[in-house]
Amino acid sequence: MSATGKLQRKRKFLLSSRHVECGGFTEYSPTPLIELTSLAQHLGIKNLFVKDESYRFGLNAFKVLGGSFAIGSYIANELGEDIDDLSYMRLVSDEVRSLLGSKTFITTTDGNHGRGVAWTANRLKQQAIVYMPQGSAAERLSNIRAEGAQAEITDMNYDDTGRYTSELAQKNGWIIVQDTAWDGYTRVPLWIMQGYMTMALEAYEQLPVKPTHIFLQAGVGSLAGSVQGFFADIYGRSCPLTFIVEPKG
């Protein structure tokens, strides 16, 4: 199956997943690719485009693409079905709940990933627990709780909070939805990366010309690896130059 064919699976899942916003139902739609004409002229380049993820499901971040596909894929796997064949209505049906019971998804986050997991669990009528490291913003905690999750800020750093989350999951039979992999834990992070590819597919279809350079944030590496993998599969040896960047400090 081609890269675009594989990625249509992720978009099919998103298209079938409607969510409540402002009292109505709004379906998935691609976020805009904005052309920054003036900045391109200032820099002396022909075109400059930026993917504006502030519109993504009203959550102001792309992270929900990964969490939603990972949780959907987990449920499909538990049912022994292909996610291609699972509509949103079936995912939230009484039949599925009777087969699987109520699942609890747990994660460590400093903000957007946890909010995406909480949002998805809420829409799929499941439970979410989110732990945030010491120093996390109170506003982000509030945003996660607003999505129906049990969430709190710990007195530990990120790595220790992650270990605490893992211990709780093992003790209680909860499902970890983390965007980083470690020995023995690779399937869910891979699903998350596959979900991120939705954004790459959108950009590929929106671009009027083949890009020459792509700039991506480093983060934990999931987005960078996902988008690079997508364009490498599309363009092969003529893949655009990719730069992985992070803000100073």
Regions found by a protein language model. Give the residues of each.
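PLP-dependent amino-acid enzyme catalytic core
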Residues: 1-249
